[in-house]
């Protein structure tokens, strides 16, 4: 039997999001490396390749961008930096071009180039083990 929270809160939210193009993925089917990793790394890499295909980005440079996101710890300053990355992209030096390019995490011009995933009852481990009711992922 479903709990009241699932029936009255989570199900309606998920249904509304699905009606607006979001894909529901059960938490046990998310492409996660561990409970400690908040990012969906494989979808993130796919999105970076798709969104930034015109700048000549290579696998090594994609991983530099991913590591830059992963290296941010908790706290307000880290959150500010991640928000800046989300808005402007992550600066990465491209070896072939010998220039610094901003690797975009989202396609703001063509929203269909982004992957929208909603999931529920997602476990995360940090200083504590928590279970989030609903999490929205855009490009991982």
Tell where the protein language model's regions lie, with residue ranges.
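An alpha-helical interface "stripe"
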Residues: 1-140
């Amino acid at each position: 039997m479903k709990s009241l929270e699932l029936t009255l809160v989570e199900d309606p939210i998920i249904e509304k999001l699905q009606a607006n193009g979001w894909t529901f993925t059960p938490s046990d089917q998310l492409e996660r490396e561990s409970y400690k990793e908040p990012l969906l790394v494989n979808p993130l890499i796919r999105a970076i390749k798709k969104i930034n295909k015109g700048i000549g980005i290579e696998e090594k440079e994609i991983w530099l961008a991913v590591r830059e996101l992963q290296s941010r710890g908790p706290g307000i300053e880290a959150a500010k930096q991640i928000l800046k990355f989300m808005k402007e992209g992550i600066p990465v030096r491209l070896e072939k071009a010998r220039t610094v390019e901003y690797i975009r995490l989202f396609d703001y011009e063509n929203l269909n180039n982004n992957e929208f995933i909603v999931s529920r009852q997602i476990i995360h481990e940090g200083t504590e083990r928590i279970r989030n009711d609903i999490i929205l992922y855009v490009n991982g």
